UniProtKB/Swiss-Prot annotation:
Cell membrane recorded as keyword: no
Gene that specifies this protein: MDV088
Biased composition (Basic and acidic residues): 1-12
Keyword match Ribosomal protein: no
Region (Disordered): 1-40
Name recorded for this polypeptide: Transcriptional regulator ICP22 homolog
Keywords associated with the record: Early protein
InterPro entries per the UniProt record, alphabetical: IE68
Source organism phylogeny: Viruses, Duplodnaviria, Heunggongvirae, Peploviricota, Herviviricetes
Amino acid sequence: MSRDRDRARPDTRLSSSDNESDDEDYQLPHSHPEYGSDSSDQDFELNNVGKFCPLPWKPDVARLCADTNKLFRCFIRCRLNSGPFHDALRRALFDIHMIGRMGYRLKQAEWETIMNLTPRQSLHLRRTLRDADSRSAHPISDIYASDSIFHPIAASSGTISSDCDVKGMNDLSVDSKLH
């Protein structure tokens, strides 16, 4: 399988007038279903939300443990019945691992929905995915989970992140969000 398929790309950088659109309408031209096209450095400088995955990414099991333990502690502090949240986090971590282990990729929209990011917020994530893919000693095929044995995820009606308005979240039932 040729690893050069993603390296030779036409220049699809956005002009400065393209960057003025609303975040919800922001779309990069797609050259790859998982991480889209290259963006200008200016796009990355303007985007602070996605800086949770800086280049170069490398495996860090201690960080993974610390991050998941923060979430478990948060669940315990915030909810009287945190069991369903613990199960949901464990299931999500396991599902992501198994999708990769089975040799499947996720498409850009799926990453954005799973990680609760808008297309603009996902720029750093997609740049890191592209970089990790180019450095990988074990290339994976271009088989996408939603195109094969799995059901594609429905487009979300919106994202909920630290910089988004979360009015009405208290009205949602735990069971409807977890299943």
